[in-house]
Amino acid sequence: MQSPAVLRTSRQVQNAHTGLDLSVPQHQEVRGKMMSGHVEYQILVVTRLAVFKSAKHRPEDVVQFLVSKKYSEIEEFYQKLYSCYPAASLPPLPRKVLFVGESDIRERRAMFDEILRCVSKDAQLAGSPELLEFLGTRAPGATGLATRDPSVLDDTASQPGDSDEAFDFFEQQDEVQPPTLGLSSKDVEKSLVGEEEEEEEEEEVLDPLGIMRSKKPKKRPEVAVRPKPAPRLTIFDEEVDPDAGLFSSDKKVSETRRPLETTQDSLKLFDDPDLGGAVSLGDPLLLPAASESRGPTSRPEHGDASKELFRVEEDLDLILNLGSEPKPKPQTKPKPLVPAKPALPRKPTLPASVGPSEPGSGPQKQQQIQAMDEMDILQYIRDHDTLAQDSPSLF
């Protein structure tokens, strides 16, 4: 953060008892990348206090400078003042809004101006370390301004002795080299002088004639190279597999299993191979262990036992049902008899007219039809409907 430019001004300090005037005359919109940006409120500081002056200013000079702060920085400073000085009466902060417009920016600037004017009028707040840090001045003697009497602040410009105490708060002080532990200041000075003389003697050496001077290259101290420690195994390093020799060649297996062959076991999985030919069983050329081991294997009892051992039923049902008796099946109940369907009624057959029709039957039917009323017609329809319902339908 660059320090603000402190300029001499002809303005008069309005708050004579504090020697400090604060105001927020304007604001500035700072545009960022794309649609980002923020608003900075410019605080004008007019003061005659020595903590804000540099070495080129006189004690009676009045200086001014601008400090730009964002809303969040002013809010943080406001909360610090309230927590450290609860008895101070300050105007409230402007409200927070989601979308800030021009009217909100103007309202915030006016309220910030009112808050900082109240701070500059209060002698305790005007000399507080929180305010000095907020304005960009961090000095070891700034913390004592809050405890000073207001009359002392008024007479700072009239006392000529204060010019010795005035120093620049905006310039960095030179870093002091820390003393070497375990040595006094004289020993440290002697060691530094001795090192400088050795460097000069190494750099400039006269030739035998004394005419020319040449620079001798410095010898760098040899650093003993330490042996690198053995790398530690991590979870990603491959460890030596103790079972790696199980799947190697026959020669490696025989070499690794030589000590195991010395121990003779009484049991063998496979019989020794039959040499056959003219070699008899009691031949002295054979090993005694071979002749002994062939004895029990030639007996027929072992052959029968091996046959029984490897005889396995091929049918899985027989294997699963070994030793289990078949359960009797429960008797099923007889199904109830279904009654036979009723016989369908037959259609009434019309009697066939045999012989010629009577001559007087036609006019009689016409007279009967004419004599029928509504009830007779309804009865006729019902009779025919019952006949149609009694007839079986295929659908």
From Swiss-Prot:
Positions of modified residues (N-acetylmethionine): M1
InterPro entries: HS1BP3, HS1BP3_PX, PX_dom, PX_dom_sf
CDD domains tied to this protein: PX_HS1BP3 (cd06868)
GO BP terms in the entry: cell surface receptor signaling pathway; regulation of apoptotic process; T cell differentiation
Tissue-specificity statement: Ubiquitously expressed.
Gene3D superfamilies membership: Phox-like domain
One protein family per Pfam: PX
Sequence ranges assigned to domain PX in this UniProt record: 19-142
Entry function: May be a modulator of IL-2 signaling.
SUBUNIT field: Binds HCLS1. Interacts with the SH3 domain of HCLS1 in vitro.
Record-given protein name: HCLS1-binding protein 3
Organism: Mus musculus (Mouse)
Organism classification: Eukaryota, Metazoa, Chordata, Craniata, Vertebrata
Gene (UniProt): Hs1bp3
